A protein has these predicted regions:
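Glycine/threonine-rich flexible loop motifs
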Residues: 31-38, 154-157, 230
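An anion/phosphate-binding loop that grips the pyrophosphate of nucleotide cofactors and donors
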Residues: 18, 85, 216
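Donor-nucleotide binding loops and adjacent catalytic segments primarily
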Residues: 93, 103, 118-218, 250, ...
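Conserved nucleotide-sugar donor-binding subdomain of glycosyltransferases
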Residues: 1-36, 65-66
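A donor-sugar binding/catalytic signature common to diverse glycosyltransferases
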Residues: 207-251
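Active-site-proximal region of nucleotide-activated glycan assembly enzymes
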Residues: 37-115, 120
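Structural alpha-helical scaffold elements that stabilize or flank donor/cofactor-binding regions
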Residues: 14-16, 77-81, 211-212
């Protein structure tokens, strides 16, 4: 409770000091409910003119996570949006997916909803060449990058990639770089490392993942938002395995596959 009080006071004090023109809130009230204790007091103070007037904008991704009490949750979201917010920015392309497709109460939102397109970093020029030189991989050789996001549920696809790589007849020309994610179980990590053969490097994490995709001839990954945006940004040919229990990954990957941006792997493909 003390930490919450301090956070709430810090945010409120910041607003009093800076008097911003725009208050951009990520996901809330669609999600991040755990932070309402510090966000709501600011929203109320702006609404009641106890803080300087500013535009309050909600920033939200393309696909919303399903809620158990969906109808009640969406009603609360709409009430908060219409009362405190001036607009919603959806980081998506409406040709691919619209907010209304994962938010049933969309038509009850009375404030403007605008689509920004997907937000993704672009790799620096020649970054792919830099990575290939760093890995000592020639222009005629093939680099495959396999990844599993945070790693919590990524063992099956990484194990499958290693098995498939071991069967390639052109291994001398093909290189595999595996990023397991920091949260992959240690036993799974040790097993992957032990099974890695020639031209295979297994590591948990890189701060330069976008550059590796820019250098790659093929990406094999799960279908999380950030990885998918990296795939689109670099244009690397991609095989994507959406996590079976995640509607968001399945829906996004399926729509992108229909547009030819990637190919979807099913469980049986593993």
């Amino acid at each position: 409770d003390q930490i919450k009080e301090q956070r709430q006071q810090a945010l409120f004090t910041l607003f009093e000091k800076e008097t911003p023109d725009i208050f951009l809130v990520e996901l809330y009230p669609f999600g991040r409910k755990a932070f309402r204790f510090e966000i709501d007091p600011v929203l109320e103070a702006i609404s009641e003119k106890r803080l300087a007037s500013c535009k309050v904008i909600c920033s939200v991704r393309d696909i919303l996570v399903e809620k158990e009490d969906r109808d009640k949750h969406e009603s609360r979201v709409v009430e908060t949006l219409n009362r405190y917010f001036d607009a919603v920015l959806v980081h998506a392309d409406p040709k691919l997916i619209e907010l209304r497709q994962t938010f049933d109460h969309f038509d009850e939102i009375s404030i403007p909803v605008s689509y920004t397109g997907y937000i993704a970093a672009k790799p620096a020029p020649d970054t792919g060449i830099r990575i290939r030189k760093q890995l000592e991989i020639g222009e005629e050789e093939i680099l495959v990058v396999a990844s599993a996001g945070g790693g919590n549920v990524g063992a099956p696809i990484l194990e499958s990639v290693l098995r498939a790589f071991g069967r390639l007849g052109m291994k001398s020309r093909c290189h595999l770089k595996v990023f397991t994610g920091p949260f992959l179980d240690q036993n799974d990590f040790d097993r992957l490392t032990k099974s890695a053969g020639n031209n295979v490097q297994v590591t948990r994490f890189t701060t330069d993942f976008l550059s590796y995709l820019a250098a790659a001839d093929l990406s094999v990954s799960m279908g999380g938002y950030n990885t998918t945006m990296n795939i689109l940004s670099t244009g690397v040919p991609a095989l994507v395995w959406p996590f079976p229990q995640n509607r968001e990954q399945r829906l996004r990957a399926g729509r992108l596959a229909d547009m030819g941006a990637l190919r979807v792997l099913e469980d049986e493909d593993l």
